A protein has these predicted regions:
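Charge-dense, helix-prone N-terminal extensions
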Residues: 3-6
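Serine-hydrolase catalytic machinery in alpha/beta-hydrolase-like enzymes
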Residues: 8-110
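Active-site signature of alpha/beta-hydrolase-fold catalytic machinery across serine-
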Residues: 50, 130-131
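Non-catalytic alpha-helical scaffold/packing segments enriched in small hydrophobic residues
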Residues: 100, 127-130
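Alpha/beta-hydrolase fold nucleophile elbow
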Residues: 109-121
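Gly/Ala-rich beta-loop-alpha elbow adjacent to hydrolase catalytic centers
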Residues: 120-124, 128
Length: 131
């Protein structure tokens, strides 16, 4: 298993939302393919962060993204539903926030911006398809 490094990365969506991603990458100097990891409707939780770490262990740089702002996360379905539906109110919200995350990933020194991919889980799957 490769040694990895992790950090939080603050970035801003076009609507002004302060977003906080979780970045994981192998300890290497070579630029790597980058993978965006879009979360389920719960927000950027431990599950999403673990997927980013696993990708890093397999040689990728990964960014688990924040779709709700300020790293909001919940375990309550009513709250998750409310936050998710807020991102549907303006058709540009999902694309703008995901694009901001993708640009943030591409800008990291560890990332080869010519080799990017995205994966998502549940709500995150929609985010990736909209991207």
């Amino acid at each position: 298993m490769a040694a990895i490094k992790t950090r939080e990365i603050h970035y801003t969506a076009p609507d002004g939302s302060a977003l906080i991603g979780y970045f994981a990458a192998p300890e290497t100097d070579a630029p790597l393919a980058g993978v965006l990891v879009a979360p389920e409707w719960w927000g950027r939780n431990e599950y999403t962060e673990q997927r980013a770490r696993e990708l890093a262990e397999h040689g990728y740089a990964a960014l688990a993204i924040d779709m709700y702002g300020d790293k909001k996360v919940t375990t309550h379905s009513d709250q998750a539903y409310q936050w998710m539906m807020q991102t549907f109110e303006d058709p540009d919200t999902i694309v703008d926030r995901a694009t901001a995350a993708l640009n943030t990933l591409a800008a990291q020194d560890e990332v080869n911006a010519e080799k990017l991919a995205a994966i998502g889980f549940c709500y995150g799957g929609k985010v990736v398809l909209d991207l």
